Amino acid sequence: MTLDYDIIVIGGGHAGCEAASAAARLGSRTLLLTMDMAKLAAMSCNPAVGGVAKGQIVREIDALGGQMGRITDLTTIQFRMLNRSKGAAMWSPRAQCDKTRFSEEWRRTLENTWNLYIWQDAATELLFAPAPETNAAPSDNLPDETTTSFNSAPGTISSAAESDADSDPTLRNAPSAAGKLAIRGVRTRMGVEFSCRKVILTSGTFLGGVMHCGASHAEGGRAGDAASHGITESLRAIGFETGRMKTGTPARLDARTIDFEILEPQYGDENPAKFSFSPETKPIKEQLPCFLVYTSKEVHDILRTGFDKSPLFNGTICGIGPRYCPSIEDKLRTFADKDQHQLFLEPEGSSTNEYYLNGFSSSLPWEVQWKALHKIRGFEDLHIFRPGYAIEYDYFPPTQLHHSLETKLVSGLYFAGQVNGTTGYEEAAAQGLIAGINAHRAMKGESPVVLKRDEAYIGVLIDDLVTKGVDEPYRMFTSRAEYRILLRQDNADIRLTPLGYKIGLISQKQYDHFTKKNTLVESLISFAREQSVKAAEINDYLKSVDSEPLSQGRKLYDILMRNNVTFDSLQNTLPKLRKFIAANEITPEAIEEAEIQIKYKGYIEREKFIAEKLRRLENIRIPENFDFHSMNALTIEARQKLSRIRPETIGQASRIPGVSPADVNVLLVKFGR
């Protein structure tokens, strides 16, 4: 057994599994360090993948060659395409998964990946060495000074300036906080020292994790798992800013004690789709339902009796929680006028009685949770497997990263997932994939993969983190993307599969499948452009779909731009169309893609024009280590923000909060229009 690797990934969650898989498949000798091999990519919270904007991210991961979409398809127990009633830019796939099988499939995938090795242990210390200037990869732009120190009160950001450097053993690895460092290895709890060239930190909620349930507090990364100590201290000692965040999870319920007969079922799609573009996975045939339940005034009154013992309200929890996934006690305080809240009862698998109560996350005392749950209709005889709890953990403000996800302070060290202040399996997996790709490419002296905001939701995610930072757990929404008509879930393969193939994560077989689909889409669009349709042969159809009849013949392409007119419904009316689709074996996926491109042509072209116009700013680079304080024409706030975040382009600078359009014009004058 060797103790030397190209890349070490710390943490076996969704980010770590994608990072390790990508790095190893690309050719780097990779070690995945995890505290429990039986819980790889564990679904620690809800047993689902996807959702609004998140589903688009999963399809992008798949299009680039990541694993999450494929493994989701293999373990799906219900599939729904959300927002079908809205425009195609808003369609978002979501799947309930069998959480046990999901983790098992990930383990099977990783154990069968050549060049990937797993070691069960806890990383406790990162090892550093001075970074030779010649080792700097294109993304290794290290700052001359360490980051500014912030107030280190509980729950706030702090840095090495406040730590006792003399007594901290990690400083034996670092010449000084201001020095340029490179990663050289990892030391574990068992005392094993691994050497490497790159490290990807994906430790989720485990760094300094503390769980809260009423007056009960315990260290841990999640229920049943120990917290991780040493890494945060190791990084703070050399100048990294750190902070605390909080998340939570609801009680798990025993299905045998629930009266499903009186609950409102929520079924999956009649014709379910899937996440992966690969033909090797198939849509699910037999689905399990979810159920809708509701709280009541009586439930709320019981919950309020525990507010004085809530760690969220009595000052015990200092970490910042997710705004868009609040606990039930948060909801009651924020929406005090509401007499009920909708909850979703979701199965955790096809062979378990365990159910997840989505919307009832709580850190109230367990007995308060118990009493309140029993007052929900259908839960009168309820047994719970475990109560809900909150968890606080360390994170690192992501403005300390390059867009490659490599840290600015340490060459060869990458962060991905919740350590960057994000929340959600999908956001974590996307970061892990990009970090794995870029760590490998840096090993080879190749430029990093940086997705732009008009290329992928993943690009929006990373740019938001690196440029704007976070002041609460970050989750993706379609509203965060300026170009969401370009970034649809249906065209993720068109946008990203050529890149995945060029990188080396998409196989020739997968790429051939992609090009075949693309050819079918283009051929159907061409047919629609060329095919003339007489008014007499289509007017009855148009009336049936409440569309204005034709006064003269039109091209099929123009007719398809109308609302309610679809390729599928036209096939019975236009035999030539039906024959063309059958003769060319055009798949339903290709038909849908062609139809969307036709209907949204004007919107797509407009967004492309705007994106190209703004991309000019992305091509104007700012010299690294430029002294923004020397530019008196900039506002003081802009000088401070630019000096701290150190944007690499004027485009990035323009998105920093506190940098005004006037400041951007000053930068344009300085660095060229």
Language model segments and positions:
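Short hydrophobic core segments
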Residues: 10, 193-204
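Beta1/beta-strand and adjacent pyrophosphate-binding region of the FAD-binding site
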Residues: 2-15
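Core beta-strand elements of the Rossmann-like FAD/NAD(P) dinucleotide-binding domain
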Residues: 3-5, 189-198
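Conserved beta-strand-loop-beta-strand element in the redox core of flavoprotein oxidoreductases
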Residues: 127-131, 178-192
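Conserved N-terminal/central alpha/beta ligand/cofactor-binding core
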Residues: 21-125, 129, 190, 202-222, ...
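An anion/pyrophosphate-binding glycine-rich loop and adjacent beta-alpha core
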Residues: 36-38, 232-370, 467-540, 544-552, ...
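A glycine-rich dinucleotide-binding beta-alpha-beta segment and adjacent secondary-structure elements
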Residues: 356-422, 450-463, 587-641, 646
